[in-house]
Amino acid sequence: MNINGRNGLACITRVRDLKEPVVIRPPPSFAIIRDFVVDMTQFYKQYHSITPYLVNAEPPPEKERLQLPAERDRLNGSYECILCACCSSQCPSSWWNPDKFVGPAGLIQAYRFIVDSRDRATEGRLDDLSGSYRLFRCRTIMNCAEVCPKGLEPAHAIERIRLKMSGAREQGGPLDTHPPLSPR
């Protein structure tokens, strides 16, 4: 929802803290279906394009794929995304290129799988994000971080993916040398 000109979740917005009159609108950049219902087809299409699940062809272990605490910590600041689309609907790059730019929500999810030690598709994920529109249309305006109800910073995850694509990828160095993302 767009509440008094700011994207947010109606379910956690405290009305008594808002300036009156309270103006509620559908989120910008999405086509309106009816009233406050918007068409999120393109948003989910971009989300599904990043392969939002672990890819691992190794035979599964008896119980589960374990991670060291440090490996698990690398997921902090990315797995908490609830796909509310507040960030993507506030992002100018998503407005201008909705069919090409993955968007902040999709990219923070891509980062989550790129740094997951249990995933075996990092190179393929990076290849899928290459090109001038999929990842590199982010201009770090930071609207995404400003409106995220979970306090996440998609632009930082996007920057780390860029680093992985450029330097660390050629050197074979891990993206994991950076401290984990953390919610604000």
Each model region followed by its residue ranges:
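Hydrophobic/aromatic-rich structural module bridging two neighboring secondary-structure elements via a short loop
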Residues: 1-28
